[in-house]
């Protein structure tokens, strides 16, 4: 279970304190799939970072009784001066997983070939996303965080990613941030709309989109 209890997040800017999330509360059970809608700047990515544990909330509490992934295809945590393989080894140590399995899976799934042995700073954005997605799936989690529908290059590779995540791991929990109505209806059970840091919950996906589309 993930329990978000009266969570707020604010940052100190040059103009003073800016509140990004206001008193957000919701619960997510194991196996549940939730979609999050919101305009740019609504606080979606901030909420994802808080749920994953990358950042703490300013106030409130997030309780987790299941393992949670980092945002899929997020490559911001890679050390650019290290090779893809060195980054892989580092992640294996952090999560205490079998390096031989993760290496074999990543080599096959990412299709990066010898680039795995090159510094990540030389990768294109698509190559970084491939490595990040492969590592996200090589380390098994109870809940996967997806910030926007999978976009990692060619459609064949994207289809492979979707099969691994939504078919082979269809028993897992998912929090999906997306602007795509079709993706939400296909992959999620219900939806929440973030508007200027405030959360509105909907059990009916169409009503969530109706409200979302009414926003200025």
Curated annotation (Swiss-Prot):
Pfam families: ABC_tran. It is a peripheral membrane protein. GO terms for molecular function: ABC-type capsular-polysaccharide transporter activity; ATP binding; ATP hydrolysis activity. GO terms for cellular component: plasma membrane. InterPro entries: AAA+_ATPase, ABC_transporter-like_ATP-bd, ABC_transporter-like_CS, ABC_transpr_TagH-like, Bact_Polysacc_Export_ATP-bd, P-loop_NTPase. Keywords: ATP-binding, Capsule biogenesis/degradation, Cell inner membrane, Cell membrane, Membrane, Nucleotide-binding, Polysaccharide transport, Sugar transport, Translocase, Transport. Residues 2-215 form the ABC transporter domain. Its EC number is 7.6.2.12. ATP binds at residues 38-45. Putative ATP-binding protein, and an energy-coupling component of capsule polysaccharide export apparatus. Belongs to the ABC transporter superfamily. This is Capsule polysaccharide export ATP-binding protein CtrD. It comes from Neisseria meningitidis serogroup B (strain ATCC BAA-335 / MC58).
């Amino acid at each position: 279970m993930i329990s978000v209890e009266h969570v707020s997040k604010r940052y100190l800017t040059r103009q003073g304190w800016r509140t990004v999330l206001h008193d957000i509360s919701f619960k997510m059970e194991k196996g549940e799939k939730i979609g999050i809608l919101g305009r740019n700047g609504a606080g979606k990515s901030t909420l994802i970072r808080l749920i994953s544990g990358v950042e703490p909330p300013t106030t409130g509490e997030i309780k987790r009784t299941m393992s949670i992934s980092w945002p899929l295809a997020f490559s911001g945590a890679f050390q650019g001066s290290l090779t893809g393989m060195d980054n892989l080894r580092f992640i294996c140590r952090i999560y205490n997983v079998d390096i031989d399995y993760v290496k074999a899976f990543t080599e096959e799934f990412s299709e990066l070939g010898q680039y795995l042995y090159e510094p990540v700073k030389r990768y294109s954005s698509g190559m970084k996303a491939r490595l990040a997605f492969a590592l996200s799936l090589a380390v098994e989690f109870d809940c996967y965080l997806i910030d926007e529908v999978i976009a990692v290059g060619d459609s064949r590779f994207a289809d492979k990613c979707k099969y691994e995540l939504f078919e082979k791991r269809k028993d897992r929990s998912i929090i999906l941030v997306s602007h795509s109505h079709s993706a939400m209806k296909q992959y999620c059970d219900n939806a929440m709309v973030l508007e200027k840091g405030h959360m509105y919950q909907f059990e009916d996906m169409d009503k969530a989109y109706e409200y979302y589309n009414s926003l200025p």
